[in-house]
């Protein structure tokens, strides 16, 4: 039995010796800190706690912060957090340090994954709600021919651009698997091209909205002289060569991962991001001039056209910062701390996915012309069906009283 226990005892002794050597080494380091510190009053001596954190000599009444341990019992921890321990007024350490900020890296990754999964749900929910609202708005502009003026045609095209962008977003999410993403097949690159094209058209149609309002209000130029083809060129045609140039750049300099994302040191995405930033800045200038004119010259005016312009400006003032802020989020890197990353994930997911919903609300559902036309259609439908109901009731009257009265008339005439 003694012979059987001897190897085990030797192993235990070796491990104990190793731990003792490590603790002695750490203790020596802490004692070195003790000798290097100069305190005249009461102070806590340098010491090592049970976890292995070295606490330097500290003046009484002070709180000490030390980095979290990198490893403990084979588990890796995030060293960006701190451990806190108080040196009491009597020169003795608190019983144990506060390790609340020291979190396992795997545990943090699990938390981040949970938040990413929630963000994916928000994205799908937001894009679904946006797509439904945009389709309703599209049908309203399609059916209500009485309100089909240039201003509403621009709204209609903006809504169409958002519909196509949402559709291509769903196509990307449902078809671009990890295998397709890594293999960089042709069809997945075409899907990315389509999504980026419709993404750019959103901003150029917003630019068309700004051009129309700036021309009508600031330049006092008759909108009757503006032509639909001008805005079609701005919204649909100009983004096309921009995306073609971007695709050529991707093909030669960053031809991987379905052209989604970017390689470090390669800036081909700025081929389409640059024009988008430019039209956003121009739109901000347009809106500044429009608001200035409205506040100075049109404040006392109550004409119906001026009221429509004011409402359009309000909608654009709300939507343009919304679109601009969400786009600029791509250039913002969240901080290293967990809270800033979580806030960034949720904020970005919400604004990106609900853009189409906000566009349909401000440019269609809150549009007084659309609401008036829908109300007229509804009243016309009610009147039409009420007439049909009256005719149906008249046709359903029994004929027996008519025959009786006719027989009585015949008898009276015979008498």
Swiss-Prot record:
Pfam families: 7tm_2, HRM. Interacts (via N-terminal extracellular domain) with CRF and UCN. The chain crosses the membrane at residues 112-142, 150-174, 190-218, 226-253, 270-295, 307-331, 339-368. It is found in: Cell membrane. It is a multi-pass membrane protein. The gene is crhr1. This is Corticotropin-releasing factor receptor 1. Belongs to the G-protein coupled receptor 2 family. One of its GO terms (molecular function) is corticotropin-releasing hormone receptor activity. It comes from Xenopus laevis. Its main location: membrane. Keywords: Cell membrane, Disulfide bond, G-protein coupled receptor, Glycoprotein, Membrane, Receptor, Signal, Transducer, Transmembrane, Transmembrane helix.
